[in-house]
């Protein structure tokens, strides 16, 4: 707990132990307090038109549940605070309602139509004030209520509220709408006003004393409503207790006023700073205007100078271009003649060459077609031979498969017959019912078999005795027939082979020679085979003949090419060479000429390379100097400005450094003088500040101690003494002149030990500050001082001070002297500060010049060296141009010699061919031989394979195998006889097998079962053999079909390829060309050679045509260029003449106005026209803005924008210079040059800015002052809370015997106050920062001393503003004295319901009283506001507690509206009995009003 809190506890204990005193809240006012007179409800639920007269103290609404008590109070609250965002009558809101319901308990209390809730009050002035609201239900599901507030004034006392709001319509009354109510009082003395905002409505009520506090915002309304709600529902409201600071503690204005004073002084100082900034803006305008004007005009000035120089160069170049165009035109005309002649020659040769090329191309196509046909023929011959072989193989395989099919068919038929016979036997046996029948059946079958054998064999006498003999006989015949069939098969096979060979040989002969008679096939085959040997021999010679013909044709072609080349060479070289000796001699001559020209050209190239190197070196030097030249000119300009500023002429860099050193010494001396004057000025300011204090004290701690001890400074008591007496009293008290006068020294003595910060010597004098005398010392006044008898053994002599502490008049007189002296010292300080600033600026310029331009400023002029380099470069360019012409002539001679040598290199190897005259005949003879060989070769290639196959089988053609058909018939007949004999053998075998059955004629049937089994086994065996035979037959047939299909495919393929082969042979015969690989190569090389020659001819002709077109176009262009060059030259010459006239005018104007040196900025001469125009355009844009307010400069600038008159820009620059010269304040700046004026303005403004900035620091409020103000405010409010506690000390509710308010300073904020007071140096970085406001610095300090506290998302400015409010430093709580527990925090959980209601009501009474005192200054002095609180359900209070409330109301002159059940009847005040009744299906509330009936 801090010291302040301990002091507060001590004062609280003292007040509680003292005798009861009358509360400060009940003074004897001469002004009566306003009172609420009545509440009127119109068209509410149960109250159509009811007025409740309110008692001056307590009005009680008594009734049962649902009688309308809460509705009445709701009407009162609604009229008092018509804010739908706040109103919420909880006890009537439906249970479980959600936020979606907007009723808030009000909608259900109203009836349909217009409703009113009106309050009538009588204020301190005796005025009748009627305020209220019009309510109306809004149709819809949200249960909205529309509220409109209004007021009435000057209403006579005789008019009732009901008569005002209703009108009589027959026997009924009608509620007037708000518009009709307004119309009713239009033109009368009654003032009707409708309010569109709740704030205006409450402002009216506050001004007339209806409510205790001005409710400016929704937050204030919320506080007021929460106060009413807390009183309405009773108890200790947590909403109120948690924010008692906002309800009880008024807003502090001390710190705000201090900050306003500080801001006022700072505002004045900053206005001066703003004026300085305006002057700085003038300075900036000076600087901006002169800079932009210089850029604008000088860039255009240098651009015109460059353009003038460039125009002269362009004129010279155009004249040179004119002459060059003439020479080029003559050269192109000569080229046109030469190229036209060559094109004519090429056109003559092109047609013949094109015909040769077409012929060669056709021959190549024929050869290639022949080769392709030959390849196809060979491929098809191979394929046909291969297919024939496959066809023969397939034919043999097919015949074998056919025989297998026939054998399988016969075997299958026999198997079928055997199976059918066995099945018939089986069926017969099955029909027998017993063995006897079976045997009989077998016997019958045996007889049938015997008959069958007789018929089949033709033996009618066949029986069991001779059956075996006949079987043996027929078996022998079968063997003989089998041998005969085998023999016929062999003969048939041999005959078939001979037939096959004959057919094959005959087919081959037909393929070679075509269709011939079979009888003449042998002769034709013999002749073909005889010629085949010679043809093969002749075909082998075709390769050698072909090679030989290729060589001859190649030599013949080379001979023709040599003749062509020789003709071309003679034509181009203008010679008539025919022999090899002549050509070789000319070749050696041209080779020697080529070597001479190459040597001469190499020498020219070397010389040119050397000259180009020299030119590159000169260009590099020139470019380097050109880069250095702008910086050199800039350095020269800076040197000139520096010499003007320093008044010195610098010859070398050493002189600049020496002057810079001297300037440093001068600056040091001026700085020492300025600092001495500053110290004197600060000392005078300190004296003036001390004497300006009300008490003249220079120690602020004395004021704090005086406030803490409750005393007054001695100097304040003597503040009104005269000037003559002031020295006497100052000397009388001596060192005790800073003493503090207190009422009781003993009461202060206990606090002295607790002092932490106080002066070394603290004097305390006991006395009454209101009646203090000087009888403290025994003194005697002397001439120069006072002798004071401190004690019998100690005297003190004090001289009269020159500046007495006592007496405001004496201090003010001395203040005038000090201020005059300070003004003089300040003026001297300003002069010295100006000198220091000037030295510093000059030193800054020197440093900048040394760092930037010193290395170049004293070097020679680079432009002179550039002129020398330009002259050397021009001479080298002339020599290079001359060498280029000579080089071109040599290269032409070199190209001509190389072309001739190239043609001779092609001709010389072919000279020997030119003398061979028989080459063409030999080539023709060889070609004829080759044709014959190629025919034989083609025949061998086509039919060689057939003849090779024919040769081994040709002998088969001698005899035709015509008896093959007869042999085949014999074979078939023998095979049929063999089959008949085999059937007879089988029938006889069957009879033999059934021999036993013949004995069954009379046998018993004991053997039938065995016979059946035997037949079944034979049947199964026969069926298996039949299935096997059928499978073999199907396989054989499938194989036969497959082989037959393959054979058919091979035959069709062979026929197709044979036919294609015949067609290819006919086609190659039609072509008439026998192609081979060499023929194709020869034809292709011939075609390519002719194509290349033709392409070369055409390319050359195309090139020449293009060149002719180009030359013609070039001639036209050159002709136009020549005319244009001549015209441009004359135009440029006129332009140069005109520019010279304008330039002379510009020079004359600039030289006469002495601005040429500022415009002729040589560093700009090295920039391009676009860059200079960009500089000028940017400056023009800035100047348009800068001179927008100056009509003269604006017009001059507009005139200068004419690019045809550059002299107008110079005139504008002169006008700007003159304008700035006129604006220079000669009383401050001693120069006529605007640039110098800018420099002096910068120095002066910098000094003024520094002085005002330091003054602003002095004006800023200190953290210590803020801490003192906060402490005083907190102490004052603690005392006020103590006074409020006196009004609560005699309150008792049940076991509660006392209620009090406890106020404490928060520990974190107490630490902050201590840091503000004592940590000035420690936290200097925060409050001396220029970047932080005082509020932000305060917040940062709070965070620094309380690092454990989180600031959240709030800004330091917001936190700092909260920390300037003293209420945030305090914690305010309510405590009750209850039984043996003593003083404890008031909480609803620790108190009974009645005690909580009484305690809460007591607190609310104090809040209302506090609000009245807080708003006293804002309210008229003749107005005391009404006081009224509510209490619903007062049954929770006993009679004693209710009487206590009555006493509180009487003591505090306050009204109270209570709702109680029927069994509660207060003894005093007005009581209304409310009973809800229903009459004629209409519900209403019956009201009976009584006064004090409880006593009876």
Curated annotation (Swiss-Prot):
Residue numbers binding ATP: 63-70
Coiled-coil residue windows: 328-493, 536-632, 861-1171, 1235-1291
Region annotation (Flexible hinge) ranges: 694-811
Keyword set, alphabetical order: ATP-binding, Cell cycle, Cell division, Chromosome partition, Coiled coil, Cytoplasm, DNA condensation, DNA-binding, Nucleotide-binding
Pfam families named in the record: MukB (PF04310), MukB_hinge (PF16330), SbcC_Walker_B (PF13558)
Entries under InterPro entries matching the protein: MukB (IPR012090), MukB/SMC (IPR050308), MukB_hinge (IPR032520), MukB_hinge_sf (IPR042501), MukB_N_dom (IPR007406), P-loop_NTPase (IPR027417)
Signal peptide feature range: none
GO MF: ATP binding; DNA binding
Basic and acidic residues biased stretches: 1082-1091
Major location (coarse): cytoplasm
CC per GO annotation: cytoplasm; nucleoid
Biological process per Gene Ontology, one example term: cell division
Subcellular location as annotated: Cytoplasm, Nucleoid
Domain of life: Bacteria
Span list, region Disordered: 1082-1101
Comment field on protein domains: The hinge domain, which separates the large intramolecular coiled coil regions, allows the homodimerization, forming a V-shaped homodimer.
Family under the similarity heading: Belongs to the SMC family. MukB subfamily.
The protein's assembly and partners: Homodimerization via its hinge domain. Binds to DNA via its C-terminal region. Interacts, and probably forms a ternary complex, with MukE and MukF via its C-terminal region. The complex formation is stimulated by calcium or magnesium. Interacts with tubulin-related protein FtsZ.
Role: Plays a central role in chromosome condensation, segregation and cell cycle progression. Functions as a homodimer, which is essential for chromosome partition. Involved in negative DNA supercoiling in vivo, and by this means organize and compact chromosomes. May achieve or facilitate chromosome segregation by condensation DNA from both sides of a centrally located replisome during cell division.
PANTHER family: CHROMOSOME PARTITION PROTEIN MUKB (PTHR42963), DUF4476 DOMAIN-CONTAINING PROTEIN (PTHR42963:SF1)
Name assigned to this protein: Chromosome partition protein MukB
Organism, scientific name: Actinobacillus pleuropneumoniae serotype 7 (strain AP76)
Organismal lineage: Bacteria, Pseudomonadati, Pseudomonadota, Gammaproteobacteria, Pasteurellales
């Amino acid at each position: 707990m801090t010291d302040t809190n301990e002091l507060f506890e001590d004062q609280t204990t003292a007040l509680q132990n003292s005798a009861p005193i009358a509360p400060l809240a009940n003074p004897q006012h001469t002004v009566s307090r306003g009172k609420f007179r009545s509440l009127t409800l119109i068209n509410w639920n149960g109250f159509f038109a009811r007025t409740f007269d309110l008692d001056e103290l307590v009005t009680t609404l008594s009734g049962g549940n649902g009688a309308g008590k809460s509705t009445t109070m709701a009407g009162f609250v609604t009229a008092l605070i018509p804010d739908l965002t706040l109103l919420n009558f909880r006890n009537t809101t439906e249970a479980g309602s959600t936020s979606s319901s907007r009723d808030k308990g009000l909608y259900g209390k109203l009836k349909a139509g217009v409703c009113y809730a009106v309050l009538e009050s009588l204020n301190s002035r005796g005025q009748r004030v009627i305020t209220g609201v019009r309510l109306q239900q809004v149709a819809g599901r949200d249960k909205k209520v529309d509220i409109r507030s209004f007021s009435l004034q000057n209403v006579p006392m005789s008019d009732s509220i009901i008569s005002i709001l209703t009108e009589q319509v027959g026997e009924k009354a009608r509620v007037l709408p708000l518009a009709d109510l307004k119309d009713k009082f239009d033109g009368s003395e009654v003032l009707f006003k409708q309010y569109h905002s709740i704030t205006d409505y409450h402002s009216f009520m506050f001004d007339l004393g209806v409510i205790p506090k001005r409710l400016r915002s929704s937050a204030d309304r919320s506080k007021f409503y929460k106060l009413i709600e807390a009183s309405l529902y009773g108890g200790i409201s947590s909403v109120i207790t948690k924010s008692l600071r906002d309800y009880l503690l008024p807003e502090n204005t001390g710190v705000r006023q201090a900050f306003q004073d500080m801001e006022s002084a700072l505002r004045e100082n900053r206005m001066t700073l703003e004026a300085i900034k305006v002057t700085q803006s003038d300075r900036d305008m000076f600087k901006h205007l002169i800079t932009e004007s210089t850029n604008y005009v000088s860039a255009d000035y240098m651009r015109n100078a460059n353009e003038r120089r460039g125009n002269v160069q362009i004129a010279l170049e155009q004249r040179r271009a004119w002459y060059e165009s003439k020479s080029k035109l003559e050269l192109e005309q000569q080229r046109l003649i030469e190229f036209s002649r060559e094109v004519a020659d090429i056109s003559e040769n092109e047609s013949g060459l094109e015909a040769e090329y077409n012929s060669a191309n056709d021959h190549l196509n024929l050869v290639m077609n022949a080769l392709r046909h030959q390849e196809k023929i060979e491929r098809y011959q191979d394929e046909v031979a291969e297919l024939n072989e496959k066809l023969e193989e397939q034919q043999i395989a097919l015949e074998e498969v056919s025989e297998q099919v026939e054998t399988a068919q016969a075997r299958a038929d026999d198997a079928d017959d055997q199976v059918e016979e066995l099945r018939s036997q089986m069926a017969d046996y099955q029909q027998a019912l017993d063995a006897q029948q079976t045997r009989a059946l077998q016997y019958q079958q045996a007889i049938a078999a015997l008959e069958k054998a007789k018929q089949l064999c033709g033996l009618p006498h066949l029986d069991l005795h001779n059956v075996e003999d006949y079987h043996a006989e027929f078996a022998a015949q079968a063997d003989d027939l089998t041998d005969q069939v085998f023999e016929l098969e062999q003969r048939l096979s041999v005959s078939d082979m001979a037939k096959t060979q004959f057919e094959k040989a005959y087919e081959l002969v037909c393929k070679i020679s075509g269709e011939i008679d079979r009888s003449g096939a042998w002769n034709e085959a013999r002749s073909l085979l005889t010629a085949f040997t010679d043809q093969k021999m002749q075909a082998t010679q075709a390769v050698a003949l072909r090679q030989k013909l290729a060589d001859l044709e190649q030599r013949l072609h080379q001979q023709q090419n040599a003749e062509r080349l020789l003709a071309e060479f003679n034509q181009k070289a203008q010679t008539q060479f025919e022999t090899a000796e002549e050509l070789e001699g000319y070749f050696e001559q041209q080779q020697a000429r080529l070597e001479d020209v190459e040597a001469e050209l190499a020498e020219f190239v070397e010389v040119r390379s050397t000259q180009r190197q020299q030119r590159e070196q000169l260009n590099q030097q020139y470019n380097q100097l050109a880069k250095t030249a702008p910086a050199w000119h800039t350095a020269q300009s800076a040197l000139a400005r520096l010499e003007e500023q320093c008044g010195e002429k610098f010859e070398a860099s050493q002189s600049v450094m020496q002057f810079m050193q001297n300037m440093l010494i001068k600056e040091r001396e001026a700085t020492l003088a300025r600092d001495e004057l500053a110290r004197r000025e600060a000392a005078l300011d300190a004296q003036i500040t001390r004497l300006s204090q009300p008490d003249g004290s220079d120690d602020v701690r004395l004021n704090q101690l005086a406030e803490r001890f409750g005393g007054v400074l001695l100097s304040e008591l003597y503040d009104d003494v005269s000037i003559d007496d002031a020295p006497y009293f100052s000397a009388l008290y001596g060192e005790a002149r800073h003493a503090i006068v207190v009422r009781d020294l003993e009461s202060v003595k206990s606090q002295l030990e607790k002092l932490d910060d106080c002066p070394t010597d603290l004097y305390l004098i006991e006395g009454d500050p209101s009646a203090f005398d000087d009888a403290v010392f025994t003194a005697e006044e002397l001439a120069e001082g006072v002798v004071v008898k401190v004690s019998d053994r100690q005297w003190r002599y004090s001289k009269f001070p020159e500046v007495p502490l006592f007496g405001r008049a004496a201090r003010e007189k001395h203040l005038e002297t000090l201020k005059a002296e300070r003004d003089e010292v300040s003026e001297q300080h300003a002069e010295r500060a100006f000198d220091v600033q000037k030295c510093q600026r000059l030193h800054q310029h020197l440093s900048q010049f040394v760092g930037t331009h010193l290395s170049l400023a004293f070097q020679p002029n680079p432009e002179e060296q550039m002129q020398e380099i330009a002259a050397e470069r021009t001479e080298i360019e002339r020599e290079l141009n001359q060498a280029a012409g000579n080089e071109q002539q040599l290269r032409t001679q070199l190209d001509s010699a190389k072309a001739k040598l190239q043609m001779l290199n092609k001709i010389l190897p072919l000279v020997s061919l030119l003398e061979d005259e028989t080459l063409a005949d030999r080539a023709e003879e060889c070609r004829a031989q080759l044709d014959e060989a190629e025919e034989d070769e083609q025949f061998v290639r086509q039919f060689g394979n057939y003849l090779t196959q024919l040769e081994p089988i040709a002998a088969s053609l001698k005899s035709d195998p015509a008896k093959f058909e007869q042999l085949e018939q014999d074979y078939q007949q023998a095979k049929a006889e063999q089959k008949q004999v085999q059937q007879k053998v089988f029938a006889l075998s069957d009879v033999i097998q059934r021999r036993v059955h013949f004995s069954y004629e009379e046998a018993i049937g004991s053997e039938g079962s065995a016979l059946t089994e035997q037949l079944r086994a034979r049947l199964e065996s026969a069926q298996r053999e039949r299935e096997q035979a059928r499978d073999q037959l199907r396989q054989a047939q499938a194989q036969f079909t497959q082989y037959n299909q393959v054979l058919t495919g091979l035959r069709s393929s062979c026929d197709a390829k044979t036919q294609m082969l015949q067609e290819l042979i006919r086609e190659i015969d039609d072509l008439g060309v026998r192609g081979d690989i060499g023929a194709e190569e020869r034809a292709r090389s011939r075609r390519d050679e002719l194509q290349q020659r033709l392409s070369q001819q055409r390319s050359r002709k195309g090139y020449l045509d293009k060149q002719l077109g180009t030359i013609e176009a070039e001639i036209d262009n050159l002709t136009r260029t020549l005319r244009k060059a001549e015209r441009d030259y004359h135009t440029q010459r006129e332009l140069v003449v005109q520019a010279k006239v304008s330039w002379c005018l510009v020079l004359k104007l600039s030289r006469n106005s002495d601005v040429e040196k500022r415009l002729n900025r040589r560093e700009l001469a090295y920039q391009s026209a676009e860059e200079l125009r960009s500089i000028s355009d940017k400056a023009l844009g800035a100047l348009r803005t800068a001179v927008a307010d100056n009509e003269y400069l604006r017009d001059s600038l507009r005139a200068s924008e004419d690019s045809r008159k550059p002299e107008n820009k110079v005139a504008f620059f002169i006008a700007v210079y003159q304008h700035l010269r006129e604006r220079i304040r000669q009383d401050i700046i001693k120069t006529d040059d605007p640039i110098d004026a800018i420099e002096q303005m910068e120095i002066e403004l910098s000094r003024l800015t520094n002085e005002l900035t330091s003054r602003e620091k002095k004006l800023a409020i200190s953290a210590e002052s803020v801490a003192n103000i906060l402490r005083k405010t907190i102490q004052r409010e603690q005392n006020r809370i103590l006074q409020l506690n006196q009004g609560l000390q005699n309150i008792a509710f049940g076991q509660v015997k006392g209620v009090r308010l406890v106020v404490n300073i928060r520990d974190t904020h107490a630490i902050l106050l201590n840091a503000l007071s004592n940590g000035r140096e420690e936290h200097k970085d925060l409050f001396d920062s220029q970047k932080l406001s005082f509020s932000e610095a305060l917040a940062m300090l709070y965070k620094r001393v309380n690092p454990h506290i989180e600031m959240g998302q709030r800004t330091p400015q917001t936190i700092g503003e909260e920390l300037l409010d003293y209420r945030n430093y305090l914690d305010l709580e309510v405590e009750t004295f209850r039984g043996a527990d003593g003083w404890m925090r008031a909480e609803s959980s620790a108190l009974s319901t009645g005690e909580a209601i009484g305690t809460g009501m007591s607190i609310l009474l104090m809040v209302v009283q506090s609000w009245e005192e807080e708003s006293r200054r804002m309210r008229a002095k003749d107005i005391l506001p009404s006081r009224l609180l509510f209490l619903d359900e007062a049954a929770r209070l006993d009679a004693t507690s209710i009487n206590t409330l009555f006493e509180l109301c009487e003591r505090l002159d306050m009204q109270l509206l209570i709702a109680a059940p029927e069994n509660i009847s207060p003894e005093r005040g007005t009581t209304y009995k409310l009973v809800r009744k229903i009459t004629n299906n209409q519900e209403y509330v019956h009201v009976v009003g009584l006064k004090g009936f409880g006593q009876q």
